[in-house]
């Protein structure tokens, strides 16, 4: 039996808007694109989606912007896949003296970056040509647009001795710990198909589980993987899990069909009608609170070895 508490996207959007506003008020944050109408009276859905994604990480990490033990003050930072710049804006506010490079070939920022933030539209898959080294390289939710092992090697070369690289990324497939997500559930089938299609594109969506290994191979030390769960919907009993599930469901559904159709039809060769019928079934299961599914979310960080005799912070301090 499907337990679906939201009749339509408007009901879901209203529930998310109320929940987000309460969270922002409690955490003292500005709305920055969340559920705000543009001058023509419409909402900017993509800006809204990225802003909500930032709040998902904010809640997941208990308000932290990173887990790496950075020096204070941090002097130079490179953010890869900046997107709407919400993370960069927040980091710059907390670290006003830091020089920050915000890298994204297709930025969507509508937030003033400030004088200390330098926009950079170069392709991070190409050789990096930065003229300075960084104390911290950060990358969040690049959605498999990057060659990750290559990224780790270039980050290693671009970091100062003792500097940190941190990746924050959702992984696939959706999984469950209590048997409510069967192998033949459309949601499980969808996850397997996403992995199949992404591997054909040489951008596997299950790569984040390998990040720590690749970091170590690139030369990083003091590497750590911290795993979190983003529920598929508000099925958890605890308040934090329920909130994460509510926001995550809305965030996923904003681009669910666009993203999935592209992989099923263009990569795997499905007929459009078959893809849409199948995805309708997947959507039902995404919203089914009787299915206790979640996406693994990984925060993986590692340090370039410090110079001998330096006073650089390590994770053991």
Swiss-Prot record:
Function: Probable methyltransferase; part of the gene cluster that mediates the biosynthesis of terrequinone A, an antitumor agent. The first step in the biosynthetic pathway for terrequinone A is formation of indole pyruvic acid (IPA) from L-tryptophan by the aminotransferase tdiD. The nonribosomal peptide synthase tdiA then immediately converts unstable IPA to didemethylasterriquinone D (DDAQ D), via condensation of 2 IPA molecules. The symmetric connectivity of the 2 IPA molecules is thought to arise by head-to-tail dual Claisen condensations facilitated by the TE domain.
InterPro entries, per the entry: SAM-dependent_MTases_sf (IPR029063)
Any one biological process term the GO annotation gives: methylation
Deletion consequences: Impairs the production of terrequinone A.
Pathway annotation: Secondary metabolite biosynthesis
Name of the protein in question: Probable methyltransferase tdiE
Entry EC number(s): 2.1.1.-
Swiss-Prot/TrEMBL induction comment: Expressed during both sexual and asexual development. Expression is positively regulated by the secondary metabolism regulator laeA.
Enzyme class, UniProt record, top EC level: transferase
Keywords annotated in UniProt: Methyltransferase, S-adenosyl-L-methionine, Transferase
MF-aspect GO terms: catalytic activity; methyltransferase activity
Taxonomic path: Eukaryota, Fungi, Dikarya, Ascomycota, Pezizomycotina
Family: Belongs to the methyltransferase superfamily. LaeA methyltransferase family.
């Amino acid at each position: 039996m499907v337990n679906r508490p939201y009749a339509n996207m408007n009901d879901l959007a209203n529930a998310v808007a109320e929940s987000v506003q309460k969270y922002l008020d409690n955490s003292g944050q500005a709305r920055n694109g969340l559920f705000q109408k543009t001058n023509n009276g419409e909402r900017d859905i993509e800006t809204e989606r990225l802003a909500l994604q930032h709040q998902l990480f904010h809640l997941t990490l208990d308000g932290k912007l990173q887990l790496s033990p950075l020096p204070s003050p941090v002097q130079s930072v490179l953010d890869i896949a900046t997107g709407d710049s919400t993370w960069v804006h927040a980091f710059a506010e907390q670290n006003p003296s830091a020089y920050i490079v915000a890298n994204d070939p297709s930025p969507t920022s509508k937030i003033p970056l400030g004088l200390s933030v330098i926009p950079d539209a170069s392709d991070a898959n190409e050789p990096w040509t930065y003229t300075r080294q960084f104390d911290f390289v950060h990358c969040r939710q690049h959605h498999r647009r990057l060659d990750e092992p290559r990224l780790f090697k270039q980050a290693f070369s671009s970091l100062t001795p003792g500097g940190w690289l941190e990746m924050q990324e959702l992984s696939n497939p959706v999984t469950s710990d209590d048997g409510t997500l069967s192998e033949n559930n459309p949601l499980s089938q969808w996850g397997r198909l996403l992995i199949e299609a992404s591997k054909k594109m040489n951008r596997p969506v299950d790569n984040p589980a390998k990040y720590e290994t690749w970091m170590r191979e690139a030369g990083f030390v003091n590497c750590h993987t911290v795993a979190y769960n983003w529920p598929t919907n508000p099925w958890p009993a605890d308040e934090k899990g329920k909130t994460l599930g509510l926001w995550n469901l809305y965030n996923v559904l904003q681009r669910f069909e666009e993203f999935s159709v592209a992989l099923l039809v263009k990569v795997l060769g499905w007929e459009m009608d078959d893809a849409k019928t199948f995805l309708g079934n997947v959507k039902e299961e995404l919203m089914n609170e009787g299915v206790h599914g979640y996406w693994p979310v990984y925060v993986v960080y590692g340090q370039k070895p410090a110079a001998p005799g330096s006073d650089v912070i390590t994770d053991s301090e």
